[in-house]
Structure formats: C-alpha cells, structure tokens
Regions:
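Conserved N-terminal entry element of GNAT/NAT acetyltransferase domains
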Residues: 1-28, 32, 185
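Conserved active-site tyrosine of GNAT-family acetyltransferases
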Residues: 30, 150, 155
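Active-site rim helix/loop that mediates acceptor-substrate recognition in acyltransferases
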Residues: 38-66, 75, 81
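Glycine-rich acetyl-CoA-binding "A-motif" of GNAT/NAT acetyltransferases
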Residues: 69-72, 145
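Conserved acyl-donor/pantetheine-binding loop and adjacent beta-alpha core of acyl/acetyltransferases
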Residues: 74-103, 162-171
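Conserved acetyl-CoA-binding loop-helix of GNAT-fold acetyltransferases
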Residues: 106, 112-125, 148-152
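Conserved beta-strand-loop-alpha-helix junction that forms the acyl-donor binding cleft
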Residues: 111, 137-147, 163-168, 173
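Conserved GNAT acetyl-CoA-binding A-motif
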Residues: 127-139
Length: 185
C-alpha cells in the first residue's frame, strides 16, 4: 500500500510478465493521459503501443494499482538513449548513471491524490538500488501542474527544447519542453 492516506493503491513493478498482462490497460491509460484534456496531443493507438513496447524493452517501470487496475504508471530508460537532450551542455550529469523518466501517466479520475509523487519516489528508490545517481524528466512547459510537482520533488530546470508534435492526424504544432534534473541521495 502507499504511504499516502488519500487513496489506497499498491505498486507493481513492470517486469516483462507484468507488462504483458497490463499492456492493454497501460495503453488505454497512456492514450487517456496524453491525448485528452487540456494538454492533449494527437498520438495514434499504433504509435502509442509501439512507444510503450519500446520503452519496456529497454527500460523499467512501475504501476500504481487501484482495485486491480493501473491508476498510474511510470516508465524510464537509460538517459543516454534520449537523443533529444543536448548532453554536451551538461557534462556534470553522468549519462551512464542517470535514468530518464520517459513516461509518467495518472488516470484523470485520481489525479491530485499523490499517485504521481508516489510513483516517482518508488521508481527512483528502485533505480538507486541499481546504482543510478541522477534522474531527468522532460515536460511540456505549459503543463504547469506537472512542472510544479517535479520542482516540489526536487527536480531543477536545466534545459529547454522545442519539438514538433501533432494536434491532429495532419496538423502539427510546436511544443516547448523543459528538462528537469535531480541528484538522487
């Protein structure tokens, strides 16, 4: 169970087996989190499925389970695999000992209940056991609730990039994103 009294959830590591069992629900969670609401962008079901499979194949993750279903999930990869980050500008970040939080998603019905914070904490504790010393996350600068959460959890802004994303299947827009870094203790 979580330490947060607001909502009784448990954690499940996203092992290959657990991921296979939860894949369809994680895909629905991903699509709900990233393609609906105020911060929506267009991502096809096929592309989302491929992305989750790719992250799972090279990274690790954890799900927050509520009533037997994933209410949230966090998936990370080795930071050295994030080709968008201008590593040459940040030689103080040890790329081989840094995890990149590639996806963090919480179902809209349970946002604000401490799930994202708990997922980040649980995931980073697991990563520290593997010798990871740093963590980085990237977020759309306009997603103020997420930016505030990450900063509250000790992440500090280190870089900005602009990415072209899809608003619809054919219409694009420019999304300014920020990278935030945290030294793990």
């Amino acid at each position: 169970m979580s330490n947060n009294p607001k909502i009784p959830f448990s954690f499940k590591k996203l092992t290959s087996r657990n991921y296979s069992v939860l894949k369809d629900e994680l895909l629905e969670l991903y699509l709900q989190a990233f393609t609906t609401g105020e911060y929506a962008q267009y991502v096809s079901r096929k592309d989302a499925s491929w992305k989750l499979d790719e992250i799972q194949s090279i990274g690790s993750g954890v799900a927050a389970m509520l009533h037997g279903k994933p209410a949230g999930a966090l998936m990370g990869i080795p930071f050295a695999l994030d080709t968008d980050f201008p590593a040459e500008n940040h030689p103080h970040i040890p790329m081989e000992k840094t995890v990149y939080i590639a996806e963090l998603m919480v179902h809209e019905d349970v946002r604000g209940q401490g799930i994202a914070s708990a997922l980040i904490h649980e995931f980073l504790e697991n990563e520290k056991e593997k010798g990871i010393t740093d963590a980085v996350i990237r977020v759309w600068i306009e997603n103020i609730p997420a930016v505030k959460l990450y900063e509250k959890l000790g992440f500090r802004r280190i870089e900005e990039i602009t990415q072209t994303k899809f608003k619809s299947e054919t219409e694009t827009f420019e999304m300014k994103k920020i990278y935030l870094h945290k030294k793990l203790k």
